[in-house]
Amino acid sequence: MPLSSQGSPADMDPGSANTNKNQNRSGSAGPSGESKPKSEQKNGSGSKQRYNRKRENSYPKNETLAGQTRRSCPQKSKTFNKVPPQRGGNKQYGMGRREEVAETQRAEFSSAEYSGPKKINLNHLLNFTFESRGHPGGPHSANGHFGRRHKWANKPFNKELFLQANCQFVVSDVNDYSVHFTDPDTLVSWDFVEQVRIFSHEVASCPICLYPPVAAKITRCGHIFCWPCILHYLSLSEKDWSRCPICYSSIIKKDLKSVVATETHLYSVGDKITMQLMRREKGVLVAMPKSKWMKLDEPIHMGDLDHIQYSKLLLASWEQILNYVIAEEKFALFEQYNAEKETPEACFIEAAIQELQDRAESLCTASKPEIEAATLSMKTLNFEATCDKPNTVMEKEVVHYISAFEEETMEPPCEDCSPTESPPPDIPAVLETEENTVTDGVLPLLSQPESKPKNDEPLANSHYYYFYQAVDGQHVYLHPVNVRCLVHEYGSLERCPEKITATVVEMDGFTMTEEVRRRHRYLCHLPLTCEFSICEIALGPPDVSVKTLELFTEEVEKRKRLRQRKARDEQRREKRIEIEENRKQGKYPEAYIALENFQQFPAFSSSPVYSLSSVETQNFVSISPVSCSPTSQSGSLLGAECSLDPSFTEDESRCPSFAQMLRAGKAKPETWPKAAHKNVAENTLTPATADSDGESDCSERVPVPSFQNSFSQAMEAAFLKLDTALPTPPSSVEKGGRRKKKQQKLLFSTSIVHTK
């Protein structure tokens, strides 16, 4: 063969001896023919391989085995589909879902499995799991169509949607906003917004300087800043945008919009509130007072002060934007610049003034063609008005409806007859007919409120919604209980009074959702995520009669009991939370000592507490004998008895002397008191009973004895019973007449054992 005839590189190389030595050394590990040169012993990354080819052959076997075990895992499940997949087809849906779950698990634990220089996520050690807001049910939800039916039930929170649902926007009148008249959830383009108006119960403050904002600007995420402060903050970043210091959303300078924050009154329980009757046409998203209602084809203009608070969008011309938006910001910036001219913030105030001037110039240049078109239209309108002037005069002369009803009105009145002579005979008849119609028509309708809307304007009620809203324009609406009372009194909401003033009984806050829309149809004009309140007021006789209130007394009282129960539960919950927080801080409740316990704390006073008939039957149990001597106890007892019983003399009340005790001998009186009878102890230890709920507003009541006191008293009574000597039976007499000796008990012995 040609290879055998040629010499090997090892033979030709002068250093072949060294190579042979290396081959001989490696012969113990494996055959010499399998060894590779140095160039072949390096892998693709340049690192040397530590093992030879024979050692490397074992790895593919393990990989195939591991692959087989991994592939065989799905086959063990009962739901595994054994049908082979089609050629060129996609994966099965079940396997794809399983792979997605495995991928998420692998992504969750990958940071903990593989160590490296980067930070390691150790959330799995804390058993920390969370679900996305969009899919709370997970893939194993019971109903697969839940998300499609309730598209807003699990919708994630959107800051821009919340901002546009709870604010009022001043927009330019150049654009078309007809879409916002049909869908309340349609977002207004942020580029069309000239000013944002926020109605809040608190005064807004800049989170950077902590002062009321000057020439305030609002971001798309809904946070308000001073214009110089936010310019200073944006200048610190090297990029064109920066993170919001509150919520870390992106802030761009061109997205900053002018904002005006208006403080509104926060209604609470006990306040007086005035509710106004509102009217809204079905299909229209603007509700107005019934007395000021008008047909709308476009959003309300900024100059309409009567309806400006009831619309979400306000149309403004370029002149109104210059006068009401730019001029006010310019005045505030100049005032701040004069006050802080020597401070480092002056440069940012100058930058804000320059941007404000650029905005005014761009607005004027954009409005020039519109001004020219408006002047041309005004000229054409004036020319048409001058041409049609005689025609309009003729039309005004022709349209006289007074002569069409009665021919007698055209005739001149007679001067001889006075106008008061003919009406008197007709007035009583007219009044009687009017009274009959009123009494025949109104009274049955008040007794039957359902029939009243049917008789009067059935079509009008089907095209309009009537409801009560706060007079200042806040989203505060009347409770259904009050609405039913008014409907029963007046027949329908359309005939209810224009305004009602009453005291607030309860305020419930809500957020608009699809479910709330289906429940309250009259609030369909509110966008999703809009916050509103339902207010229950105390209606009185001026607005509702006493007879109507009696019909709804049961329902009103039921709601009152529910409120009281809710308040009690809230109070108990606050107490539990307070105790838990104090326990975390090492503060524990103080020990409760029952001072009404006469066994532990006997009362000695001059006023009689008990009438003692005999000393033997009624005895006070004094303090524990460990803390006082028997003589002191006897003296105190005698003193107490003397104060309680007037038959005691002064000599008997004194303590016996030592000589008297010696003379008395065995007949000495008992110095240790006896235990009091059970009924006396029970009478002295009866505490005041608490109410059923364990709660009482009266703070001066006697508290309920704790378990510690009752248990200690029971133990003390048991020990006192054991201490009292039981009556000994009569001693048995023997036949011989001798008494039986009492068996003596050996206490201790003094005998000594002697050892040898």
From Swiss-Prot:
Q: Which PROSITE patterns match?
A: ZF_RING_1, ZF_RING_2
Q: Where in the cell is it found?
A: Cytoplasm; Nucleus
Give its E.C. classification number: 2.3.2.27
Q: Where is this region: Disordered?
A: 1-100, 682-702, 725-756
Show the CDD domains listed in the entry.
RING-HC_RNF10
Q: Which InterPro entries match?
A: MAG2/RNF10, Znf_C3HC4_RING-type, Znf_RING, Znf_RING/FYVE/PHD, Znf_RING_CS
Zn-finger segments (RING-type)? 206-248
The biased composition feature labelled Polar residues covers: 16-29, 59-80
Pathway membership of this protein? Protein modification; protein ubiquitination
* Record-level GO cellular component terms: cytoplasm; nucleus
Q: Which GO terms describe its molecular function?
A: transcription cis-regulatory region binding; ubiquitin protein ligase activity; zinc ion binding
Primary location class = cytoplasm
Enumerate the Gene3D superfamilies for this protein. Zinc/RING finger domain, C3HC4 (zinc finger) (3.30.40.10)
Q: Which Pfam families match?
A: zf-C3HC4
Keywords in alphabetical order: Cytoplasm, Metal-binding, Nucleus, Transferase, Ubl conjugation pathway, Zinc, Zinc-finger
Q: Which domain of life is it from?
A: Eukaryota
Please give the family membership noted in the entry: Belongs to the RNF10 family.
The protein's name: E3 ubiquitin-protein ligase RNF10
To which species is this protein native? Xenopus laevis (African clawed frog)
Which gene is the coding source of this polypeptide chain? Answer: rnf10
